[in-house]
Amino acid sequence: MKTMRGLRNCSNDAVTLDLTVHPPPPPPLPPPAPSTVSSSTASTSLSFDEEETSESKIGRLISEHPVIIFTRFSSCCMCHVMKKLLSTVGVHPTVIEIDDGEIAYLAVEAAPVLFIGGTCVGGFESLVALHLSGQLIPRLVEVGALWA
């Protein structure tokens, strides 16, 4: 077997290629109506009245969802770890992206922030502390987000 100058072959293993023809992907879904925002982690769609204030939207979302995370970016690493921890115990939170101006309505200084049963738990450190203390699962059961 020929090798390129300065490089050597590290393996004699053969590579297998899967040449199976897969069906084409389904067509994309139509965009949501202008006044509706859908969440991939929520079981229901999140609808907003266009005239509703940011403060009342946030308050309503907190009261409607037993476990909700507000974040600046859904791709935030701390938000991802919070979702992963909650999903490990069987809960899939609603995740809402908010902008810097809306953070003030949450009465916290940083995002992501977690609410369980309408009560602010706090950020990632608070969630981990609640879990390590053994209080997370009973609290999730209490608010109906998890079955005992």
From Swiss-Prot:
Ranges of Low complexity composition bias in the record: 35-47
Keywords associated with the record: Cytoplasm, Disulfide bond, Electron transport, Redox-active center, Transport
Compartment list: Cytoplasm
Residue spans of biased composition, Pro residues class: 22-34
GO cellular component: cytoplasm
Cysteines paired by S-S bonds: C76-C79
Disordered: annotated segments: 16-55
Taxonomic superkingdom: Eukaryota
All copies of domain Glutaredoxin, residue ranges: 55-147
Entry similarity comment: Belongs to the glutaredoxin family. CC-type subfamily.
Role summary: Has a glutathione-disulfide oxidoreductase activity in the presence of NADPH and glutathione reductase. Reduces low molecular weight disulfides and proteins.
Protein name stated in the entry: Glutaredoxin-C10
Native species: Arabidopsis thaliana
